[in-house]
Amino acid sequence: MSKPKTPRSIAENEAQAIVSNLRVSPRKLNLVAQLIRNRKASDAVATLTFSKRRIAQAVKKALESAIANAENNHQLDVDRLVVSRAEVGRSIVMRRFHARGRGRAARVEKWFSHLKIVVAERSQETETKAEAA
């Protein structure tokens, strides 16, 4: 007696990778995520490789994990993969105190983020329309 299978939360032509608790604010992580949304997976990896932002390497690692999941777990064609979604979410906020003048203290907030990257395989007819345009 096993539990019934839960339905997939993403489509059959998609694969995902999730990274929790990245030590960067969601606002800064979203700037990097905007660079790769709706781009070919190979172009997105190249963009992240040459990005000057510190968190770009962690995003690149997550993207490469999503590509590997698509290839190995779902048998999708790597050459036709597109970054369909790059979702950024808030995680915990670590609070520290910074000593100020007159014996006071100021709160310093260190934000953490979640990242979810979903890659999808483009269909043949969509690809030919994009090349024709």
From Swiss-Prot:
Query: GO biological process annotations for this chain's record?
Result: translation
Coiled-coil regions, chain positions: none
Its GO CC terms are:
cytosolic large ribosomal subunit
From the Swiss-Prot or TrEMBL record, what is one GO molecular function term?
A: structural constituent of ribosome
PANTHER family xrefs: CHLOROPLAST 50S RIBOSOMAL PROTEIN L22-RELATED, LARGE RIBOSOMAL SUBUNIT PROTEIN UL22M
Q: Which family does it belong to?
A: Belongs to the universal ribosomal protein uL22 family.
Q: How does it assemble?
A: Part of the 50S ribosomal subunit.
Q: What is this protein called?
A: Large ribosomal subunit protein uL22
